[in-house]
Amino acid sequence: MRDKVILLVEDNPDDEALTLRALKKNDIQNQVIVARDGAQALHYLFGTTGEHEEHAPGVVPQLVLLDLKLPRVDGLEVLRRIRADERTRLLPVVILTSSREQRDLVEGYGCGANSYIRKPVDFGQFVEAVRQLGLYWLVLNETPYAGA
């Protein structure tokens, strides 16, 4: 599980810290690349500006954890671009958001999300949600990008 890179797209520093803490608490030791807005996520995935020097062009993460309400480029547009590009169209994308809006849920799946998880307010419940997410997407699930 350790060699699979996770791209966390999250603009809220508190939610970023909670997500990283929940991953660590569940012994998910994968490298996590953090993009703090939609434009950074697209730059990481498609290598357009070199903002992420640790990223080798053409290397696709095993999983994207995507918030919806992002600056510069919103999460749904990031998802649309992921699905529109041949290099990333099969990339697992889990929307991890605090949005309670039904239209976000429907539009997220309509744009090609693989999963939609509402962030629990309780940290213990959030840790458990991250544990289950990690178990499924990083251990049980197989993607075309394995070993990439």
Identify what each model region corresponds to.
Residues 70-73, 82:
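Hydrophobic residue at a beta-alpha junction
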Residues 18-24, 33-63:
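Acidic, metal-coordinating helix/loop segments flanking the phosphotransfer/catalytic sites
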Residues 40, 121-134, 142-147:
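C-terminal output helix
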Residues 114:
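Short, glycine/charged-rich "phosphate-handling" switch motifs in NTP-dependent
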Residues 67, 97:
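Active-site residues of response regulator receiver
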Residues 2-3, 28-29, 59-63, 87-92:
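His-Asp phosphorelay/catalytic-motif detector in bacterial-type signaling
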Residues 117-118:
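Residues at the ends of beta-strands that form strand-to-helix hinge/output surfaces
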